[in-house]
Amino acid sequence: MEKEKRNQFLATGFFLFGIAFLYVPSILMVPTVIAQNAVLLKGIALVFLSIAAILVGTSFKDKQRIAVISGIGLAVGLSFLYLPVPSILSGSAFHILFACAIAFGMTTAAKQAAAIGSALLACIGIVFLYQPFFPALGGTALHLLLPGIIVFSIVFSQKTLCERISIGLIALGLIALCQPFLMLFYQTGFQLLLAGLTGFIVAAHR
């Protein structure tokens, strides 16, 4: 019981610090030193929010409430990504989607629906990655691909298949980065590699 309360306290702390590091550097009144290190602070924020999501998924008993909140968080992240919102919000979309995907995957009871939805989200991310008509959509592909892979790797019943898909993405990413012929394939190799590594790590430790 004490360990559970401690983890809940840590989850709250990591969440608050993550939010602070995510949004404080974008406020105009902050000192110059903080504003100059905004990228570093946002990187730390992603780590803190991810840790908070993992602790929330393991230490709180009301899994259904966490799943609903994190599902709303996913919707909010998508709205920040595609709706005309201030830059301080659009710049935080990836962090929100990444952290909420972890919490949602760990707590949702609708495993089958979540697996289908996350697979669809990842597929849309891949389509956005390679479509040549709207460059702005290509810039948001990783925002869809990683959360989709994370949720799918957690909720899908066949762990071995998740690992194989992830290994396939890793192989495709490496091939893309090593081949000199197709520039679009080369430019997207890192995203495929990152998605594959993320999916494999999540599937191996779920």
Located regions from the model:
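Membrane-helix interface and helix-disruption motif detector
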Residues: I27-G43, F60-I66, F80-H95, A109-A114, ...
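Alpha-helical transmembrane segments of integral membrane proteins
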Residues: F9-T12, G43-L46, S92, A115, ...
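Polytopic alpha-helical membrane-helix bundles and their juxtamembrane interface segments
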Residues: F15, L49, G138-V155, T160-L177, ...
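Canonical alpha-helical transmembrane segments
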Residues: F48-K63, C100-A110, P147-F156
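Short, Lys/Arg-rich, polar N-terminal cytosolic tail immediately upstream
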Residues: M1-K3
